[in-house]
Amino acid sequence: MLPCLFPAYGSVVACKPSAIDRSPFGLLSQPKQTNRTLIRRPKVTKAFMAIEAMRHCSSSSSSEEGGAAATTAARSAVRERLQLAPPSPSPSPYDTAWVAMVPALRRGGGGPRFPQCVAWIQRNQRGDGSWRHAAAAHQQLGSSPEIVTERDLSSTLACVLALARWDAGSEHVRRGLQFIGRNMSVAMDDQTAAPASGSVVSFAAMLRMAMEMGLEVPAVSQADVRDRDAGVICHGGRTEYTAYVSEGLGNIQNWNEVMKFQRKNGSLFNSPYTTAAALVHNYDAKALQYLDMLLDKFGSAVPAAYPANIQSQLYMVDVLEKMGISRHFVGEIKSILDMTYSCWKQRDEEIVLDMQTCGMAFRMLRMNGYDVSSDELSHFSEPSSFHNSLQGYLNDTRSLLELHKASKVSIAEKEVILDNIGSWTGCLLKEQLLSSAMKRNPLSEEVEYALEFPFYTILDRLDHKRNIEHFDITSSQMLETAYLPCHSNEEIMALGVRDFSSSQFIFQEELQQLNSWVKESRLDQLQFARQKLDYFYFSAAATIFTPELSDVRILWAKNGVLTTVVDDFFDVGGSKEELENLVALVEKWDKNDKTEYYSEQVEIVFSAIYTSTNQLGSMASVVQGRDVTKHLVEIWQELLRSMMTEVEWRQSRYVPTAEEYMENAVVTFALGPVVLPALYLVGPKMPDSVIRSQECSELFRLMSKCGRLLNDVQSYEREGSQGKLNSVSLLALHSGGSVSMEEAVKQIQRPIEKCRRELLKLVVSRGGAVPRPCRELFWSMCKVCHFFYSGGDGFSSPTAKAGALDAVIHEPLNLSCSV
């Protein structure tokens, strides 16, 4: 594979793929050198550090082997992380310190119950006197080493208290207190900037504990200790929250209430520090067994959360999908989803009791074809489920966002639970966006994006680019002081960058060849026709982006251009005689027939359809192992007949019923020649019985009806001025004046949503005659229709979607966004 160039001081340029990645059917010429240089000069960021291992200069003779080796190594690192038995999570100093404070004897005497934790604390103090989580230390790469967070102070103070409690390591204690004193302004700033989070309550309470133990924190007096405890306790409906931060509330906590949240494994919230804090104040055999298990498993230190396997694995899968590289890890992802589904059916506490994990699991399982009922989310159907939870008190945006995303994966006309969840989560997220605190939240852009663009309006490659450019290689999922493992983020970033940049090179070559085809076919000479090659190719590249599906993209774009030409010919370009001549030629399908061309326009249009369809038929017949050309011809014949029907209606001023209109309109929307032939090239065998099955017909009907209605909503005014009827104007017309055009537009939204949900159900359901990769094509086109026709007629506009087109095909990745 030729090297993907990652300039150390510029944007990523398109990467040239290996010949083995290209089309197996010879539609594309051999790779050519491109003269298009797309280089910017963004600042150097951590994103470039993530891809250094894969950067090879083009002048190096070993760059091809090196690039391939780096890709293989990166995939192996990610694959290791995806295993069901992942590497041990990194130790958490904060949690380990609280475990170290647990006494050996039931009433608090006899020294530490876990002396190995005390020893670990002594061994792992950093040079500046602090104790920091490994993820926090990693975050300093490429940035100032002086950055200190309130979380670092909490971890350090907890370790100081653990050592002081057992009179161990006086020098460690002194250095730790000095670190806290030097950075005390961080804690004070955090306390004044936001409501009391768990770590702030803990820090204030731990400062009080330190003073009660006779420890002197430099630059800290009694007046500096902001005791938030009373405010938390008297805040109604926050019992779960106060239980979670129980280590910071000490003797003022109601420990009997706390233990109501104990899970089957003996823990409180799967949190080592919360469980340990409970044991410090209130002996419990099951809680002690939980901590014993952790130390048996991890040795002398504990992680920030355990178990957190399901959430961390789902998060990893989600990241791979967002970066556009999940196809490289199909087997590993299937194992994770199978395991998650098994836990889902057993109502595992790690899923059911956690809002974020439950939302992610539901969305990912449903989209991957697992049978999950929205009834399992009934405990989240009302906003009180959030307000009265730990996530609610922490104003946990991530949990809200994941639940909101889950609500959009609806596959029935009425899924009341999902509709309710979507309503209240959407309202709360909008409220959060208006708050000043949200402006400091790195999730704010993601929330805005999710609210404005539901997943069914987003084209995959456009989304991948955004996610790559905003990917934070140092980020990790966290709640309070709990970090989840975040290994291999550099490899994920590198793979995403290489994959996207390589695909851009392919896209640019394919589009160049398609432009040549338009000229060779003389389609550019048709003055009446809209020139929509770029848009059609973009819609293919943005949804069918893998290198091996090159022929599908070429077909999609060619037939998209041809259907647009035919549509314009029937609308404005052709006379009645020309239209009848074209229909007759397509019906006979014989270029050597004696039928004369009525005009040069007819000859150009028919020749382009005839030549392209026969070439495609030959190619598809090889893939399928049988002759499919006849079916491809039938698709064009049906389209032209239906278009002629519309012309006859218009000329005779016939007003069809809504049912008559829609039966014809699902054909004249002209997605048949684009999507149906593509089914033959995706890979799976498509016998004639399958291609003509009720299931395939229903997939086509739902996709086409959804697209047609979306188009009608945006075009009814323009078409009305041309004397054309569509579903909006027919609804108003047949109502006898009781429905205005504005009301008709609103009413049309319901069947659009119904069609989309029913289509998604067919796509994600297991079983059926049509293979899943083929069903995905119908869903891809549905998303394309939503993309172009949500908020305007983006297809007819020459500029509305030009920026998106450039982003996917031409503009290189701008990694200056990454941090």
Curated annotation (Swiss-Prot):
Disulfide bond annotation, renumbered to this chain: none
Chief location of this protein within or outside the cell: plastid
A GO-annotated cellular component: chloroplast
Tissues of expression: Expressed in roots. Highly expressed in stems, flowers and panicle.
Enzyme Commission no: 4.2.3.229, 4.2.3.19
SUPFAM superfamilies: Terpenoid cyclases/Protein prenyltransferases (SSF48239), Terpenoid synthases (SSF48576)
Record-given protein name: Ent-beyerene synthase KSL2, chloroplastic
Disruption outcome: Severe dwarf phenotype with reduced shoot growth, reduced crown roots and growth of branch roots, abnormal leaf blade morphology, dark-green leaves, short and wide edges, leaf tips rounded and almost sterile seeds.
Function: Diterpene cyclase involved in jasmonic acid-dependent defense mechanisms in roots by mediating the biosynthesis of labdane-related diterpenoids (LRDs) natural products such as ent-beyerene, an antimicrobial compound. Catalyzes the cyclization of ent-CDP into ent-beyerene as a major and ent-kaurene as a minor product. May be involved in the catalysis of an early step of the gibberellin (GA) biosynthesis pathway.
Biased composition (Low complexity): 58-76
Source organism of this protein record: Oryza sativa subsp. japonica (Rice)
Uppermost EC category: lyase
Keyword flag Metal-binding: yes
Gene that encodes it: KSL2
Region (Disordered): 58-77
Residues annotated for Mg(2+) 3 binding in this entry: N711, S715, E719
Residues bound to Mg(2+) 1: D567, D571
Organism classification: Eukaryota, Viridiplantae, Streptophyta, Embryophyta, Tracheophyta
Family as reported in the entry's similarity comment: Belongs to the terpene synthase family.
